[in-house]
Amino acid sequence: MMPSSFGAIDQPVSRIKEESLMSAPAVPDRFTTLPDEHALQATVVALEEHGFSVEVVDDLDAARQAVLARIPEGSSVMTNTSVTLAETGIADAIDHGGDRWESARNKMFALDFATQGQEMKAIAGQPDYALGSVHAVTRDGTLVIASASGSQLASYAWGAANVIFVVGAQKLVPGLAAAHERIYQHSLPLEDVRAQAAYGQHSQVGKVLEIHQELPGRIHIVLIRQSVGF
């Protein structure tokens, strides 16, 4: 698929993240500060009240183990472009870990976007499991995800049978205003640097998805007690 940044369906981030972040702009500490235990637990309760299931883990290894344990063998799995999925090793485990799961990403990129673009979109948009992260989680239980192209948003909102979000606890914010501040003042500047290193182009906020409510059982959140991702 044509390159498009900010969590869109494109190339893996692990190869260029270290190089790109060497020139990343400074961002306010409030966007990377971990919440206290009271705020974390209050957010978990709010998320559960809105139909999301949540588990809290201590580190990146535990997050990877938690995610992989939830995915039945043979499932089609789309690893949407995510610094968090790269840092936890989840993307590599799915896309380069053998034949335990069907990598929707690998299947998609075996096709030609110029002649098979719609088929590629169908593969990415309707997997058994869509994996990714979010840019903010509000205290009252809303998930906020920004994207340049919106290519991953369809699977999150409707297309995927199951969705698993892996989220660093630093992304917890008081409300929607703070969520949008975090996107524009923190996530976008960092993603812009990454996009220039990966694709030679700037990023942008083209679309923003807010998930306020979900039918129980479809969206699972693995919340990490560490700062990870943008």
Q: Where are the regions a protein language model picked out?
A:
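Short N-terminal helix-initiation segments at or just after the protein's N-terminus
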Residues: R15-P25, G74, A104-F113, V167
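Flexible, glycine/proline-enriched loop segments at strand-loop-helix junctions
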Residues: R30-F31, S53, N106-F109, V163-Q170
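Short, compositionally biased "basic patch" segments
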Residues: R15-V45
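N-terminal active-site beta-alpha-beta segment that forms phosphate/nucleotide-binding
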Residues: D36-K121, Q126-L131
